[in-house]
Amino acid sequence: MADPIRVSAPISGTDRHLTLETGRFAPQSQGAVVATIGDTRVLTTANAARDVRPGVDFFPLTVDVEERSYAAGKIPGSFFRREGRPTEDAILTCRLTDRPLRPAFAEGFRNETQIVTTVLGVDMENPHDVLSINAASAALMISGIPFEGPLGSVRIAYSTDGEWLPHPTYAESDASTFELVVAGRELDNGDVAVMMVEAGGTERSFYFYEDGAPKVDESVLAGGLEACKIWIKESIALQRQLVASVIATSGPIEPLEYTPVLDYTPEVFAAVESAVAAELAEAVTIARKADRNAATDAAAAKAVAALCTDGAEFAGQEKAVKEAVRSLTKKLVRKRIVEEGVRIDGRGVRDLRPVSAEVGVLPTAHGSGLFQRGETQVMNVCTLAMPRMNQMLDTLSPVNEKRYLHHYNMPPWANGETGRVGSPKRREIGHGALAARAVLPVVPSQEDFAYTLRLVSEVMSSNGSTSMGSVCSSSLSLMDAGVPIRGAVSGIAMGLVKEGDNYVTLTDILGAEDAFGDMDFKVAGTADAITALQLDTKIDGIPADVLTAALQQAREARLQILEVMNAAIGAPRDEVAETAPKIVTLTIPIDKVGEVIGPKGKIINTIQAETGADISVDDDGAVGIVTIGAVEAWRMEEAKAAILAIVDPPKAEIGKTYNGRVVNITKFGAFVSILPGRDGLLHISKLGGGKRINAVEDVLTLGDEIEVVVEEIDDRGKVSLRPAGDPPSGGSGSDGERESRPPRRESRSEGAGASGDVESVSFDDSFDAELAGELGDLGPGSERRGGGGDGRRRHR
């Protein structure tokens, strides 16, 4: 085995190092790098096919992240005990890795390329997602694949003291108000061009704001985008050091030979421009998406008919002609924006489309909101549930459950098309995660609002930024559901067109402007704080001043949208919907948890059956936490009263008569419930009206109601009972039948007392046996009776 090549450098502002290593693992891979921070490490490989697959008219890049449970010292919890489909975290890391890398490959490179990150170890302190980006860039740099890198990436967190922390641990992230993941490349002038941004507020950010932490607004965010450049440069420098070490050890890196693929030749483009430029110039002024697409398709059909028929100059090149039509359409759209400041639908560069908002669109839902901006329409539905509906996670991070769920669905009919309907694709998972990240900071914690929340965004119509439409409709449905969020959240998608040194920022982009532009820039937030940001660019980065101006332009649009949303619903409803469960949370002494649950859940199950409420019991090591929920409030209140009666049972009074119910039968008597949480012992000697009886079951059965009088309460609170009035005389049989029944025989275990002796059990012994659990689980209908401490056991 060859000696590995390893380079390492300290991360400024921390006590940790970033390490890159190659030559130890995956020797047959074209590029393979292990990246490490702390004890978290990933192996990323990069490989490309030698030839272009026939018929491929796009760059076939795939990025996969393989999370191995052994990295965290776990065995997968699935039935087969091995990893299956990627987790949501893995899919999001795939997208995070893909987005900055894709525009950095050489133009015309169409060879199938695959990047695979395998998580080898996690220390539960350092996340592995940013390592994947840096390792992928390094692997591509030593692979020979035509990649215009290196790219560096960093996560920074904004602390409550107003400082940006590089590569924060999980604990540091939880204690911060905002996180930024930024990837970029270093320019010739030493500046860093930002290629990708993924950012959002933390779950407790608004709690920190209430305690005085500085809010993250546009100026703070712009400062963060500038601050991150030092750590991006450090990563890039380390990758260059690795490349230099590889060359010094193994010689020059052999580049992958490939033939650039051109979608069309300049001659084809010129012919298309001559044939249909006028038709396309007219088509790109049509505001309605379907009509515009129809006009563009008609122009493409005309070009194909004119240029590709038998004997024509470009016969057999239909695909090239169609690509040239698309390229000409893009050119015309961009030219009109830059030169005239007019967009496809006639708007100016800062104009919003018509915006509308509604709530309560689904009467049976707990909360619902409908948001529309132009031809983009999204309905969001909020469902509230008990905390036990939190999603359990099997991840490689310290997070093991999720209580705020956002599911995004975009069926093909939202674009007037046909297609596959079913499980979500990576895009849908990514859009749902972005919308969740934008809204989660304003959602109250589970301690303040005990519900599990599931939000579902249904895209009804798509023409630009359905993810930000999901943010707006989520905010509407949460307020309609009565969730006390800390402020309405709106979102907007911005675009950019760059021609030479001229940058034009677009507000509220259409789908076509997204496709033909140079940047997709999404911003979400409340009136005074940003909660999420996502940026992707197709060019060599965006200057800092352009980004700062775009943030301010986005703020103007967000505030306009908030006005429309506030007109629909200005504040969360005072109460949750009638159809939603009503939830109350109680804190009880931890030593009472067992009493509330009962043996094998007997007590809590009985309360649930009698009240119809849903009850869950947990503890945090110091106190017990009881959560009670029911759609009807009275059911919740009844269950609450029953729990409180167990925790602090009412006191019985000596000499008072109670109507009780037999809840347990032992060989020495019957336990009778006389008050919620309060039982007393009716000794066998008090039964039978002065006559000796051989078994309690001769006169009482479980569930019988009986009037009893409190005879004695000892200093430990144990209650002794006697029957009120005439003692019970037995079951359904006549007195004669009972008297004619032969006496019970006593069987004894080896070493027991003489046969026929009746065991004498004291009042204290009876209670102690019951409390110690010696009597077993005596539910309704049970025949089992616990034996005494001397080994004797009665048999019928």
Predicted regions and their residues:
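Extended amphipathic alpha-helical scaffolds
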Residues: 1-49, 53, 150, 247-397, ...
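Short flexible coil/turn linkers enriched for glycine and charged/polar residues
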Residues: 1-3, 12-16, 26-29, 37-41, ...
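Glycine-rich, flexible beta-strand/loop modules in the N-terminal catalytic cores of phosphate-handling
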Residues: 29-114, 119-126, 193, 197-210, ...
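Flexible, glycine/charged-enriched surface loops at secondary-structure junctions
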Residues: 107-113, 148-150, 235-255, 290-291, ...
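Mobile "lid/hinge" segments at catalytic clefts and subdomain interfaces of large enzymes
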Residues: 145-284, 478-574
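Long, charged amphipathic helices and adjacent flexible linkers at domain junctions
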Residues: 256-258, 262, 560-587, 633, ...
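Short glycine/threonine-rich beta-strand-turn micro-motifs
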Residues: 295, 303-304, 308, 620-631
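Intrinsically disordered, low-complexity mixed-charge segments
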Residues: 610-611, 616-624, 630-668, 674-678, ...
